[in-house]
Amino acid sequence: MTEDAEKRRYWLMKAEGEPRYVKGINVAFTFEMLEEITEDGKMESWSGVRNYEARNMIRDEIKIGDYAFLYCSNCKFPHIKGVMRICSNSHPDDSAWNSNDPYYDPKSTPQNPRWYSVGVQSEYKLDRPVTLRELKMHKENQLKSMELLNRSRLSISRVKPEEWKFIHELSKQPEPEEIIKARLQEEEKVAKRKRKLNLSDGENKAKSPYSSISENDASLDIIKRSRIKDVRSQKDNAL
């Protein structure tokens, strides 16, 4: 083991795994997105942290060469998919100064920054994603002290070396059957909802007087204007 590896600390950093829009901007961030951004050696700024305890970890503890799990939250099956490498020390988070940014904070300024970020790069994917459900299966033994499981609201948490190693070992094993079953059940629920929406949409279109007319058909506009005229006539007659 190299000297850098011996000094390395381990972290878990949360990002939103499914689309969510703030100020019209999608704040989701996945490991695949990180891979694409950093594939040519570029650095991505881990910005948007707006919790003081997590901010302090970024500012005072996280260092170049540390590793972090990228943990996808805000999804049906929160999970760890890959590992990031910290490639810069902390610096003021300039996203807080941009009024158009989802994480804008008017109380943070370049002269008096309130929030900090670090640079990250994708390092490698796990052999398979490890879900929160699976981690919780080991809460009474190997992962009983893991911060993620005991302080779940933190957006950044520390990971002990033995926890880091154990999670990697989990990723090399087949996913537990109960989790596979739960995922399949959820996928079926989603499929049923989609089928129901499609069916409902089809029924509504069938009821529409325009359902058999192309959007480009000039007669469509004539029919619409005719119906508007009919409505106006009915109102006039009522008066």
UniProtKB/Swiss-Prot annotation:
Gene3D superfamilies: ph1033 like domains. Keywords: Nucleus. Residues 193-214 are annotated as: Disordered. The keyword Protein biosynthesis does not apply. The keyword Nucleus applies. It is found in: Nucleus. InterPro entries: 5hmC_binding, EVE_domain, PUA-like_sf, THYN1-like_EVE. CDD domains: EVE. It holds the Pfam family EVE. Disulfide bonds: none annotated. Its main location: nucleus. GO terms for cellular component: nucleus. Transmembrane segments: none annotated. This is Uncharacterized protein C21.03c.
